Amino acid sequence: MQNLFNFFSHRSWLIIPKNLFISFSNDLNLDLIRENITWKTIDEINISNSLSKLSTIDLLDMYIVEGECINFIDKEKLLFLSNNSYIYKFNIDIWIPTMLFEHFKNNQLLRRYELDIQNEYIVSTDEIGVKTDIENYDETFIQADNGYDIFYYPLGVVSNLLQCKIIDLKKILSFPCSLYKIPFEKVSELKDKYLMNLKK
């Protein structure tokens, strides 16, 4: 299990329906550069700009889309892409520490749950919407060595979405995935817009 916690200790990812991926890919101008690799080895593949790195895992009717740049995809874009569809967004960063879970559906943000620590000791919560069924998971399975169990909340949500136990999530580290590159210009555009929105 610790391999799973270690991998997701600093990750951002989406879960989107398969039929939405073409629109998502076109919007980001994704360029496929490798196939049939795994998340176990993906960090060993160097790309000049880590923000340009995006990977996908095919899970029958949905994709897990992982990449640091997902942090910079603004809310408006996700709302637009969720038209007649859904998008789940997740972020875990133990180094801050912080975590985020968002659920978009039919151009609406239905649920947002974010935790971070302020003043070193106080856990701050930002919450929109009511807790959903997919957020009810067996918390006893999340026991990370670093002691930040509550910040792995997104893994509990993902286990319910994939209808598996949290302990079984480690299998996805060995699933075949595809590696894409986002053009540097597109990454800069996403980042600039993200920083601009922070100033508002």
What residue ranges belong to the model's regions?
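Alpha-helical protein-protein interaction elements
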Residues: 5-6, 31, 87, 172, ...
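Short, flexible coil/linker segments at or flanking structured domains
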Residues: 2-4, 78, 89-92, 98, ...
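Short, extreme N-terminal segment that most often corresponds to the first beta-strand
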Residues: 1-34, 196-200
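Intrinsic disorder/low-complexity signal
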Residues: 1, 26, 57-60, 65, ...
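Long, compositionally biased intrinsically disordered terminal regions
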Residues: 117-200
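Short, intrinsically disordered low-complexity segments
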Residues: 33-115
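Broad structural signal for hydrophobic residues in well-ordered alpha-helices, predominantly aliphatic
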Residues: 24, 77-81, 158
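Residue-level signal for functionally critical sites in structured catalytic/ligand-binding pockets
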Residues: 4-10, 41-42, 105, 109, ...
